[in-house]
């Protein structure tokens, strides 16, 4: 696609040649110009050649103020406008040149610009006038070439319009491509191609054309409205809000833009509020806000999917594993490679001790986001936890969840310690079994009530396992002699043998 900016750049690169052509065409024409106007023209010419367009423009403004009938000043100002991409202003100045001095050069240049704007009839009038007025061979050749080009462009336009009306958008697009390669400043053609792109499911290309149209046509509220609608349908509420505001800057009473603005602003506010709650760790509040998002916009599926993705995250972070797995799965049914949902469901699986499922989710996430350090660390942790679960799982020993509070852990420990105290058993075999069980129960309590030891265990490292400690003796080794006489209900005092009596 040829952008307006690119075309202006190419035209700008041809300006020194046009200036030389002008000076040759009007050699000696500046004789008789008053000194101040001549000075302004010369300064403007030098600045234009140096590419200092804004400064050059101010000098040509001054020259025209000093002599409003100076066609050279208008021509040079038109040249600056052209370099700045202001084709409408350039055409006005070229029309003034034609009015002041019937001239082939200015007519040809104006015809070129009119053709780039898609004004075929007006461009053809200029080219035909050149041909009628005894032009030089080069001028005649150029005018005839442009006239032929204009006829061909009109033929292509007729075909494109016919294809569009027949809803054959696939056929219309290449025809419009060919026309817009020449008519780079035709806003209506860009809007027509944008409509074709929308129908063909290519919203990003439609946005590109509509943005160009918004720049080419002043007060183009319709283009801004359409851009905002497309962004909204894509789920980009922030860009949608930005574009609809541009529409309202041009016309604050624009009904469609104002209606869309209210909707997007409300949705945007809810999403921003929900994200702020997430940053603060207020997950229940964030879930409530995202529920509101789905109620605010029930008709655009992407918002429900994004809301559920964030609810999945909140539930996982809030250690509501069962609910998190349900919501994350709903998201993944729609988007099987959604990396965020895969990570959050993996974490929820870990809370439920479903290590293999967590590993599978992390591996899928990694396949779709290879350089994500969080995924790599999560996968390694899940693999360690699977290996750990095949050895000794302190949570399972006490029969508590991974997110159990300290009070729950102590309560479970006391119950099991009283149940499995070896003094409760008579036979030697039963005592040995109880001793082993009791040691595991006491070890589980030791690890899970110590924040640092629990953190290590949750990361997949057993702080009481010599192998996990990477060499050396196990500083946490325990046997029955260590625990003999230990009171699971006491908080101090000397050791004693705990006896149970049942009536």
From Swiss-Prot:
Primary localisation category: endoplasmic reticulum
Segments for region (Flexible linker): 374-392
Keywords assigned by UniProt, alphabetized: Chaperone, Disulfide bond, Endoplasmic reticulum, Repeat, Signal, TPR repeat, Unfolded protein response
Signal peptide: 1-31
Cross-referenced Gene3D superfamilies: DnaJ domain, Tetratricopeptide repeat domain
GO molecular function, one term: protein-folding chaperone binding
Gene Ontology CC: one annotated term: cytosol
TPR repeats, residue ranges: 37-70, 71-104, 105-137, 153-186, 187-220, 221-254, 267-300, 305-338, 339-372
Disulfide bond annotation, renumbered to this chain: 247-257, 312-328
J domain segment(s): 393-461
Listed GO biological process terms: cellular response to cold; negative regulation of endoplasmic reticulum stress-induced eIF2 alpha phosphorylation; positive regulation of translation initiation in response to endoplasmic reticulum stress; protein folding in endoplasmic reticulum; response to unfolded protein
PANTHER family: DNAJ HOMOLOG SUBFAMILY C MEMBER 3, LD25575P
Name of the protein this chain belongs to: DnaJ homolog subfamily C member 3
Organism the protein comes from: Gallus gallus
Organism taxonomic ancestry: Eukaryota, Metazoa, Chordata, Craniata, Vertebrata
Gene: DNAJC3
